[in-house]
């Protein structure tokens, strides 16, 4: 098997694990374990906490003491055990701590999988710029396949989804032992601990434009987590209406939600055109408007013919909402930051989005869901309209508050990756 194919298998399993539970665990906790919205939000906030502290720490370990593929193997071995135990947990506080341990082991594997891929491709004499994107696409495929499997097997409200994720983690841990050895980087005496942790990038907050950018990254990061947490429970709640109880939306909500991931792949291909033609500010603004539409379509969507079209449109615009912000934001950081702290700045960007933003978004969205619930019945239309209003508010403030002059030549030859 070629190294490219071996890495595709790794990428497939990496995101298959996540897809097994990320969008359905909320439904399991709400409908089966009867957790509150705040409980569910707290459990999902573990992802944000782990994203803040773990990638930098694990990066130091992989750089200094442990080969990357071995660190990757150990992380997934921990995930396998923790996810197996999580399937038996029924207390919300315990679920938070268990999923926090899982997140602290899993979140570093995203960066480690990229590092392993780049190193293996370099060892094989392949150009990562052209060879890596097809490998990463297999990750999206793995995520979608897992969602479909859990949905078709009717496991969305069952703890078995966690057993599936545990088994896949164990398989990937064993598979990692077969990967080529990744040499430990030689120590550089001039590299400080703060630099390794990405803390030197905090100097960017002295620049007003960069400070505003990172602030918006955090606030929009809060939006990214909302549909992962509550999109699936929202669709399951249509079962309360006898008219929709046997509908496709209620029976297979994850299959419908997987259209969002499919849309991601399509919108990725359009990013170079939009960046060059309209500039980063406009592309990021389009993302915020797309988030407004995402939530707005959810507010008025249902399993009826017209309502289903709105739900489908919500899934499609998700691709724009997610990709246009994450990737254009990364390109902006690449352009604006000095090369000496560029890697740290990219890490700070991801920490603000997937760490602080995701943590805040998980907790506040859970509180909002509870606030607009009466006797366990959620007013989903109001909930989604509140989230849509928040995204629209961000778009308006961003339009007037973020200054950026578009120069097509700056991004003419810049590669865009996801």
Swiss-Prot record:
The keyword Transmembrane applies. One of its GO terms (molecular function) is symporter activity. GO terms for cellular component: membrane; plasma membrane. Disruption phenotype: Mutant grows very slowly on xanthosine. Transport is abolished by the proton uncoupler 2,4-dinitrophenol. Pfam families: Nuc_H_symport. Uptake of xanthosine. Can also transport other nucleosides such as inosine, adenosine, cytidine, uridine and thymidine. Transport is driven by a proton motive force. This is Xanthosine permease. It comes from Escherichia coli (strain K12). The lineage of its organism: Bacteria, Pseudomonadati, Pseudomonadota, Gammaproteobacteria, Enterobacterales.
């Amino acid at each position: 098997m070629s190294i490219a194919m071996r890495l595709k298998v790794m990428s497939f399993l990496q995101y298959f694990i996540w897809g097994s539970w990320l969008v359905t665990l909320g439904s399991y906790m709400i409908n089966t374990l009867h957790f509150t919205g705040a409980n569910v939000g707290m459990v999902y906030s573990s992802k944000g906490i782990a994203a803040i502290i773990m990638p930098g720490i694990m990066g130091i370990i992989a750089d200094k003491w442990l080969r990357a593929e071995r660190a990757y193997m150990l992380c997934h071995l921990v995930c396998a055990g923790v996810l197996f135990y999580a399937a038996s947990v029924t207390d919300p506080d315990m679920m938070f701590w268990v999923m926090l341990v899982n997140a602290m082991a899993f979140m570093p594997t995203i960066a480690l999988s990229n590092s392993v891929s780049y190193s293996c491709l370099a060892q094989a004499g392949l150009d990562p710029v052209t060879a890596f994107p097809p490998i990463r696409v297999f990750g999206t495929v793995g995520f979608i396949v897992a969602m479909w499997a859990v949905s078709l097997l009717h496991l969305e409200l069952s703890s078995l989804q966690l057993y599936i994720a545990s088994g896949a983690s164990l398989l990937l841990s064993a598979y990692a032992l077969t990967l080529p050895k990744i040499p430990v980087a030689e120590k550089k005496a001039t590299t400080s601990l703060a630099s390794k942790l990405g803390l030197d990038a905090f100097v960017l907050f002295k620049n007003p434009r960069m400070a505003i950018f990172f602030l918006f990254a955090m606030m929009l990061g809060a939006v990214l987590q909302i549909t992962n947490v509550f999109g699936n429970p929202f669709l399951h709640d249509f079962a309360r209406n006898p008219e929709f109880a046997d509908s496709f939306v209620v029976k297979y909500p994850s299959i419908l939600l997987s259209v969002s991931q499919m849309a991601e792949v399509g919108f990725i291909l359009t990013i170079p055109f939009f960046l060059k033609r309209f500039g980063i500010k406009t592309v990021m603004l389009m993302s915020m408007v797309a988030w407004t539409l995402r939530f707005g379509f959810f507010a008025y969507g249902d399993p009826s013919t017209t309502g289903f079209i709105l739900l489908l449109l919500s899934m499609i615009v998700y691709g724009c909402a997610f990709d246009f912000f994450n990737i254009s934001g990364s390109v902006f950081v690449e352009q604006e930051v000095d090369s000496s702290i560029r890697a740290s700045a990219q890490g700070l960007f991801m920490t603000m989005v997937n760490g602080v933003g995701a943590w805040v978004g998980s907790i506040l969205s859970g509180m909002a869901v509870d606030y607009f619930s009466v006797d366990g019945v959620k007013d989903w239309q109001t909930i989604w309209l509140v989230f849509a209003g928040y995204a629209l508010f961000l778009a308006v403030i961003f339009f007037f508050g973020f200054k950026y002059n578009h120069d097509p030549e700056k991004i003419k030859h810049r590669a865009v990756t996801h």
